[in-house]
Design a protein with these regions (language model features):
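Short coil-to-beta microelement around the adenine-binding A-loop and adjacent beta1/P-loop entry
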Residues: 36-38
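The feature captures the beta-strand-to-loop junction immediately N-terminal to the Walker
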Residues: 56-58
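Helix-to-loop junction immediately C-terminal to a conserved catalytic motif
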Residues: 71
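ATP-binding/catalytic-site motifs of ATP-hydrolyzing domains
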Residues: 80, 86-87, 232
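Glycine/charge-rich catalytic "coupling/switch" loops of P-loop NTPases
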Residues: 273-332, 362-391
Length: 405
């Protein structure tokens, strides 16, 4: 039954349809399977016309399921899906004016590139001259004009993906849905295709919803990113805000490479100053303004989760002198040279942490090295709240823009 539904829906995509607007609205959308498994829970999101929205999260988080519900490949269990001013829960995929690009290219092997791109238009009985114009325009955009006479077997992976995108472009849809389109490509091609997709969005000025598990794709492509875990939205924000002001511990650890260092710490008060004890040897003093926030929040004597990005921990003497209240000593366990930077792995208590430092560092495994943290870039998460729900209330020192999550 699912295979039949899938094939029927894919045929509907090829036949196409039209809408006057490309904005989307998902209101309390849920997906529950017959066995009771909840794949997507209470999904609320407003997508503006011409936005490039990324759904990102680990495997099984519900991102592809949500995309398939938007496409019409999956039935919505409850909630509402609007495209423009029309409720489309029960609208056939062909009438949603949506084009989808999959992880596998799904090209017809016996057809040329031209015929693969033109196939959907031929089914819709579009005049031949219009088909020819649309195919050549899309091929020019994607730089595959010289490939139009070739068969898919004669193409590279990147070229096949361009053809798959071209097949979607010729339909002039209002919304593109892309389900991990680059995951079958090697690392070099992924970088190239990321650039091509970004250019494509700017040129076409259409709405794109893009699913990936790769945070690099998410951060480099999206105007906004939806971070998902266990079918629940964790945060919706711009790439910069996600990185600088994560909404909870999951987002803090998921976004960023190397990931944010997350360490349990006890909050103590000495007069008007607060200290964060991360281990017997690592105690960080906070300035008055930051201390007051934790005191007023009732965190003195409690255990919190402290987050600090690897690039905000340095072994540079000048940096250490400027951040003397946050300096500490640790033994280097692993040294990773990455060309323009070095990752030093060390420990705070029983937690392995990372510092992203200048490649001219002299630190090597086994060395005891003095580090310091930039406390203005420190995040403090409420561990008690973490135990009560999957959504944490952050006590963070940097301002956070409103999130729709």
């Amino acid at each position: 039954p699912y295979t039949t539904l899938f094939r029927s829906a894919m045929r509907s995509f090829i036949l196409g349809g039209k809408f006057s607007m490309a904005s989307l609205s998902l209101k309390n959308v849920c997906k529950v399977y017959p066995n009771g498994f909840v794949a997507v829970k209470d999904f609320n999101l407003e997508i503006a016309d011409q936005e490039f929205i990324i759904f990102v999260g680990p495997s099984g988080c519900g991102k592809s399921t949500t995309l398939r519900m938007i496409a019409g490949l999956e039935e919505i269990s409850s909630g509402e899906l609007w495209i423009g001013d029309k409720l489309v829960n029960d609208v056939e995929p062909k009438d949603r004016d949506i084009a989808m690009v999959f992880q596998n290219y799904a090209l017809y092997p016996h057809m040329s590139v031209y015929d693969n791109m033109a196939f959907g238009l031929k089914l819709r009985k579009v005049p031949k001259a219009e088909i020819d114009k649309s195919v050549h325009e899309a091929a020019k955009i994607l730089d595959i004009e010289h490939l139009l006479d070739r068969k898919p077997k004669a193409l590279s992976g990147g070229q096949r993906q361009r053809v798959a995108m071209g097949r979607a472009i010729v339909r002039s849809p209002k919304v593109f849905l892309m389900d991990e389109p680059l995951s079958n490509l090697d690392a070099k091609l992924r970088v190239q295709m990321r650039v091509e997709i970004s250019k494509l969005h700017k040129r076409l000025q259409t709405t794109i919803i893009y699913v990936t598990h790769d945070q690099t794709e998410a951060m480099t492509l999206g105007t906004r990113i939806v971070v998902l875990k266990d079918g629940i939205i964790q945060q919706v924000d711009t790439p910069q805000n996600l990185y600088n002001t994560p909404n909870n511990i999951f987002v803090a650890g998921f976004i960023g490479s190397p990931q944010m260092n997350l360490i349990d710490a006890t909050v103590a008060q000495e007069g008007s100053q607060v200290t964060l004890k991360m281990s017997d040897d690592v105690i960080i003093k906070l300035p008055a303004e930051k201390s007051k926030k934790l005191i007023d929040g009732g965190y003195v004597g409690k255990t919190v989760v402290v987050g600090i990005r690897p690039e905000d921990v340095k072994d540079d003497p000048e940096f250490i002198a400027a951040h003397a209240d946050s300096k500490f000593v640790s033994t280097i366990r692993v040294y990773e040279l990455l060309g323009a930077e070095v990752n030093l792995h060390y420990e705070i208590g029983d937690v392995t942490c990372t510092a992203k430092v200048n490649p001219r560092t002299t630190a090597r495994p086994g060395d005891e090295v003095t580090f310091a943290m930039d406390v203005t870039r420190l995040h403090v998460f409420d561990k008690e709240t973490d135990r009560k729900s999957t959504r944490l209330t952050p006590v963070t020192y940097t301002s956070r823009m409103p999130s729709s999550a």
